[in-house]
């Protein structure tokens, strides 16, 4: 494999995981903050809020997993290598 392609693949894999984690990380922090605020306002709605929060965490985390899949594809099944 061309060393330039290998180096670019490693850099792109690192960037794909790093950038894919920024948005969901910020979203999870915001969602958790609002969930705590909502539970503090209405303690009787804790179960519903927690369920919605965990479901939204799963959707947000799937975006990070997509970035990881792209990184693994670049590292181990590189489409640019001959």
From Swiss-Prot:
The record marks 61 as: Reversibly protonated during proton transport. CDD domains: ATP-synt_Fo_c_ATPH. The chain crosses the membrane at residues 3-23, 57-77. The lineage of its organism: Eukaryota, Viridiplantae, Chlorophyta, Ulvophyceae, Oltmannsiellopsidales. The keyword Ion transport applies. It is found in: Plastid, Chloroplast thylakoid membrane. F(1)F(0) ATP synthase produces ATP from ADP in the presence of a proton or sodium gradient. F-type ATPases consist of two structural domains, F(1) containing the extramembraneous catalytic core and F(0) containing the membrane proton channel, linked together by a central stalk and a peripheral stalk. During catalysis, ATP synthesis in the catalytic domain of F(1) is coupled via a rotary mechanism of the central stalk subunits to proton translocation. Key component of the F(0) channel; it plays a direct role in translocation across the membrane. A homomeric c-ring of between 10-14 subunits forms the central stalk rotor element with the F(1) delta and epsilon subunits. F-type ATPases have 2 components, F(1) - the catalytic core - and F(0) - the membrane proton channel. F(1) has five subunits: alpha(3), beta(3), gamma(1), delta(1), epsilon(1). F(0) has four main subunits: a(1), b(1), b'(1) and c(10-14). The alpha and beta chains form an alternating ring which encloses part of the gamma chain. F(1) is attached to F(0) by a central stalk formed by the gamma and epsilon chains, while a peripheral stalk is formed by the delta, b and b' chains. Signal peptide: none annotated. It comes from the Eukaryota. Its main location: plastid. InterPro entries: ATP_synth_csu_bac/chlpt (IPR005953), ATP_synth_F0_csu (IPR000454), ATP_synth_F0_csu_DDCD_BS (IPR020537), ATP_synth_F0_csu_sf (IPR038662), ATPase_proteolipid_c-like_dom (IPR002379), F/V-ATP_Csub_sf (IPR035921). One of its GO terms (cellular component) is proton-transporting ATP synthase complex. It comes from Oltmannsiellopsis viridis. Gene3D superfamilies: F1F0 ATP synthase subunit C. It is a multi-pass membrane protein. GO terms for molecular function: lipid binding; proton-transporting ATP synthase activity, rotational mechanism. PANTHER family: ATP SYNTHASE LIPID-BINDING PROTEIN, MITOCHONDRIAL, ATPASE PROTEIN 9. PROSITE patterns: ATPASE_C. In plastids the F-type ATPase is also known as CF(1)CF(0). It holds the Pfam family ATP-synt_C. The keyword Glycoprotein does not apply. Keywords: ATP synthesis, CF(0), Chloroplast, Hydrogen ion transport, Ion transport, Lipid-binding, Membrane, Plastid, Thylakoid, Transmembrane, Transmembrane helix, Transport. This is ATP synthase subunit c, chloroplastic.
